[in-house]
């Protein structure tokens, strides 16, 4: 999600320049995490827990890497400002991630690309693995760390890699048949 990535980048720029306008810009941009999709934000609720959408519209895309980037941006914003408002948005999102993590999990081996109905391509999966590892470390949430470890490509045997590749090909092609052409 660009909001989270941009917040993280602007916080780092602020640390280099001392320009407080950058922090104000981050806080203004972070307000989308407090608004529902219907109200022009990125906030949704699933199973009673908050999630942040990379693509805020219906049907909900539920793209994992965008959600993870949003959490890292909120973490950076809170760490810099100490504003409990952003800590609360971060905590709500982490609780939503923990409660809904199975949604993005393929048999404890790989990650799904949101609601698109196919497994993540390898480069997206590696990104999900790394971001989830970072969030597990930042939060101390063991469930995030365990899931990240289960997604480690280097820990997969030949049969698991073959299964993942075949399921990826099948689900990717099936999704292409379902999705309307632009």
State the predicted function of each range:
Residues 4-19, 69-83, 127-141:
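Well-ordered alpha-helical scaffold segments within catalytic/enzyme domains
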Residues 55-86, 90:
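A contiguous pocket-lining binding segment that forms or flanks enzyme active sites
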Residues 80, 125-182:
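Terminal, non-catalytic domain-edge segments
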């Amino acid at each position: 999600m660009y909001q989270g990535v941009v917040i993280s980048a602007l916080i780092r720029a602020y640390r280099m320049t001392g320009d407080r306008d950058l922090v104000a810009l981050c806080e203004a941009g972070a307000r989308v995490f407090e608004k529902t999709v219907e109200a022009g934000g990125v906030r949704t609720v699933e199973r009673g827990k908050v999630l942040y959408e990379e693509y805020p519209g219906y049907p909900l895309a539920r793209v994992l890497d965008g959600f993870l980037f949003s959490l890292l941006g909120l973490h950076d914003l809170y760490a810099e400002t100490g504003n409990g408002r952003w800590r609360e948005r971060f905590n709500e999102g982490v609780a939503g991630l923990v409660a809904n993590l199975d949604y993005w999990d393929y048999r404890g081996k790989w990650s799904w690309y949101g609601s698109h109905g196919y497994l993540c391509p390898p480069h997206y999966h590696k990104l999900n693995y790394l971001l989830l590892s970072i969030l597990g470390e930042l939060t101390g949430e063991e469930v995030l760390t365990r899931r990240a470890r289960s997604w480690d490509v280097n820990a997969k045997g030949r049969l698991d890699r073959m299964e993942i590749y075949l399921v990826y090909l099948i689900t990717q092609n099936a999704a292409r048949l379902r999705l309307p052409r632009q």
